[in-house]
């Protein structure tokens, strides 16, 4: 590092959005996407190691703490900060409580096709609102969506995407949590 060089490390997805904003940060920052720790990065070799990763999640703080209670508390705080600070600063959302309900509903749906229409009906919101909130969660690296692999057999039938969480510890079902990890 050069003398006098200053580095800012942030855990926010907001820096990624500066590319689309009015202020130019050209040459003043480098965007690095840090994903949760993987099996290979941790050098896991036993089934117990894998169980710990599945139970605690791949984020460094809860994983290295090695404590289920700490991991649950960290996960709750992460979700709350995501809604109250990150999403609220990027989107004009009037009803943060309903957004929290959406975020609370999503982990149970990992591994199955994500129907925006079903979520819309559950939350009594407009389709556009739910789609916008899901996009905001993607931009902030809370979730990511994968489209089905392969060409559609019938053009009129469009398959829904599946979604997964960067914080896999929030997924309640063991098999879905394993799918989320992979």
Can you say where each PLM-predicted feature lies in the sequence?
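Interdomain motor-coupling "hinge/lid" segment immediately C-terminal to the ATP-binding subdomain
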Residues: 3, 12-115
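Accessory nucleic acid-recognition modules appended to NTPase machines
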Residues: 68-182
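Conserved beta-strand termini and adjacent loop/short-helix elements that scaffold enzyme active sites
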Residues: 10, 34, 146-148
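A generic local structural motif
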Residues: 2, 18-20, 130, 150-151
